[in-house]
Every structure is written in C-alpha cells, then in structure tokens.
Amino acid sequence: MTNDLSAMNGTAAQVERAERIKRDVNAEFDRVATAFRSFARRQEDARRAETEAVLVILEEKRAEVMGKQEAGYFIHDWQEIGGQVRQLIFRDARYQAIKSNREGRRRWSEERRRG
C-alpha cells in the first residue's frame, strides 16, 4: 500500500512509523550540520574550506537518505539513529581524502617545528 501524501511504500502502519523516523533522521542531519557550521566559523580559511566540503558531503548524504521511498528502509536502518549520520560522512571516500590531507599537513608541520 502506498500513502499518497508521503509517496512512501509500505503498509499504512509502516509508512506512519517510517515518517516519524524520517523526521528524526532529518533532525539529526540538521544537528550534525549545525555542529559542523559552528566549527567552521572558528577555523582558519584552509580548514574552513575542508569543513565546508564535509558539509557538501553531508547534504548529499541527506538527499540520498531522505529520497528513499521504502518505509522498511527507515524502520530497519534508522530506527536507532545514534551516530549514523557521522558514520555516513566518515565512510565517504571524499571525507577520507580530506582527513588524509589534514594528517599529512599536520605531520609536515610537526617535522618543520622539530627542525
């Protein structure tokens, strides 16, 4: 059965439950985005640019997740949100490249300080 209001697939009860979960998931994406934006405001230009790139990844992940139409997806995969939004970001190859670049710059900076 499909709920015409949400266009989500599943029984009426599944769709109702999934819509509640979906609202919570969207709120979690908002919370994580707010934290990254707050952090970015305190960073220097290069690091801020990287954090803004992470925000782009976050919004792409949000669109991907929120675009799912199967009630079962939200019920099965998102019932317990926890750190799932952060994990989606951390597993992204672009985030891994940003992290690797940061670590490389940190090592280079430490080596320069040591002389």
PLM-predicted stretches and their roles:
Residues 1-115:
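Charged, low-complexity intrinsically disordered segments and flexible loops
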